[in-house]
Amino acid sequence: MLQGPGSLLLLFLASHCCLGSARGLFLFGQPDFSYKRSNCKPIPANLQLCHGIEYQNMRLPNLLGHETMKEVLEQAGAWIPLVMKQCHPDTKKFLCSLFAPVCLDDLDETIQPCHSLCVQVKDRCAPVMSAFGFPWPDMLECDRFPQDNDLCIPLASSDHLLPATEEAPKVCEACKNKNDDDNDIMETLCKNDFALKIKVKEITYINRDTKIILETKSKTIYKLNGVSERDLKKSVLWLKDSLQCTCEEMNDINAPYLVMGQKQGGELVITSVKRWQKGQREFKRISRSIRKLQC
């Protein structure tokens, strides 16, 4: 679970809440790479961190000491936002080589990430983590991994076992920056069921979606249509299919947001999100539009 202010790892990414979950990963202390004999297990479809990796089987225990798939799933989700931040094209490869190390039937030895792979990812991603107050964890220090050889996972340029650099993920439709005029804003407000000014308390990932829990005392209601006060008391909004796209618009857990959306199947689904910046011309226009809203 991703916790509120002061602990987000890089939500759509990047904001303090995910790092709160990442802390759980660091509590294993120093990893011991001399594990008992590993077993090959199919990579589950709900291991979103390694979705699309080009091998089917992983070793348990893994290189982080997780002995059950439940542990892997609980800890891996916190790192998805770091991958989506695209601080390095091989971030997923590096993390998956630890969370879900490749398992080959004819090889008993666990294949670790190469030292150079770790160094490259650390050099690019550690500053991103540091910006949110979290240092690169000791358990991932690159000196723990072997120098480049045939029995370690190298950078994409020389590796054929794991996928090469992926295309940059698309921007989530709800998070696209649209330069709307007043009429466009009015139309957007009218076609949605709710418009709220919110602050985020907590964020979690469920399957392909993002569940956003609101700070109840920091919520301003601008419009409700078919949405009851009871619906809002749940203080839960959803950003659908968000693990397949990025949302840089929503990358600060401490910022207020204007969100609009629709009620779908009993859930409040976000269709538009904008960071609320007091005094910004666009939000003055939005405020005027809300005050004279007539749908």
Curated annotation (Swiss-Prot):
Soluble frizzled-related proteins (sFRPS) function as modulators of Wnt signaling through direct interaction with Wnts. They have a role in regulating cell growth and differentiation in specific cell types. SFRP2 may be important for eye retinal development and for myogenesis. Disulfide bonds join 40-103, 50-96, 87-125, 114-152, 118-142, 172-245, 175-247, 190-295. The FZ domain is involved in binding with Wnt ligands. Residues 172-295 form the NTR domain. It is found in: Secreted. It comes from Homo sapiens (Human). GO terms for biological process: BMP signaling pathway; branching involved in blood vessel morphogenesis; canonical Wnt signaling pathway; cardiac left ventricle morphogenesis; cardiac muscle cell apoptotic process; cell-cell signaling; cellular response to X-ray; chondrocyte development. Residues 1-24 form the signal peptide. Belongs to the secreted frizzled-related protein (sFRP) family. It comes from the Eukaryota. Expressed in adipose tissue, heart, brain, skeletal muscle, pancreas, thymus, prostate, testis, ovary, small intestine and colon. Highest levels in adipose tissue, small intestine and colon. One of its GO terms (cellular component) is extracellular space. This is Secreted frizzled-related protein 2. PROSITE patterns: FZ, NTR. Gene3D superfamilies: 2.40.50.120, Frizzled cysteine-rich domain. GO terms for molecular function: endopeptidase activator activity; fibronectin binding; integrin binding; receptor ligand activity; Wnt-protein binding.
